[in-house]
From Swiss-Prot:
This is Minor capsid protein VP2. It comes from Sapporo virus (strain Human/United Kingdom/Manchester/1993). Its main location: virion. The N-terminus domain points away from the virion surface. The lineage of its organism: Viruses, Riboviria, Orthornavirae, Pisuviricota, Pisoniviricetes. It holds the Pfam family Calici_MSP. It is found in: Virion; Host cytoplasm.
Length: 165
């Protein structure tokens, strides 16, 4: 019976040793997984830092060169200089006659400039407002400002000749 108890104790001790070895192997695998996770996290953080630096450089570049790039892009797309600046956000207005000109493509601008339709409309509106210059007297000239004092002028040394008629 003691032989059987000794064998059972040996098997129990071997089972305990196997459990301990298994636990050590598991802990080593867990440590390896944590190490791999830390390496991945470090790589990810380095990439995030590089992306943030790149984003800051891009934001800085766009804040400095962005408006010029937008204007150049609009010019390359065929807009005239004023329309390109307006597309880029300049806020300037272009008034022809009594009309506020919208943003137009350069081809549209050329056709308007060649036909002079906008100029003729502006002149006709001015005619309705001011009338025609035909048959009207010239408007009086008005001079504004401080009056200039003049001094008397004496003609010295000029003796007109005499005539006998």
């Amino acid at each position: 019976m003691s032989w059987l108890v000794g064998a059972l104790q040996t098997f129990g001790s071997l089972a305990d040793v196997a459990g301990t070895v298994s636990n050590i192997v598991y802990q080593q695998r867990q440590a390896a997984q944590l190490e791999k996770q830390n390496e991945l996290m470090e790589t990810w953080m380095n990439k995030q830092e590089a992306l943030q630096k790149s984003q800051m450089e891009l934001t800085r570049d766009l804040s400095i060169n962005g408006p010029a790039a937008r204007v150049q892009s609009a010019l390359d797309a065929g807009f005239d200089e004023v329309s390109a600046r307006r597309i880029a956000g300049s806020g300037e207005r272009v008034i022809w006659g009594n009309l506020d000109r919208p943003i137009m493509h350069a081809g549209t601008m050329d056709s308007i400039r060649q036909t002079k339709h906008l100029d003729s409309l502006s002149h006709s509106l001015a005619t309705f407002k001011n009338g025609t210059p035909f048959g009207k007297p010239a408007p009086p000239t008005t001079k504004f400002g401080k009056p200039q004092a003049t001094t008397a002028q004496i003609n010295i040394g000029h003796n007109p000749g005499s005539s006998s008629v």
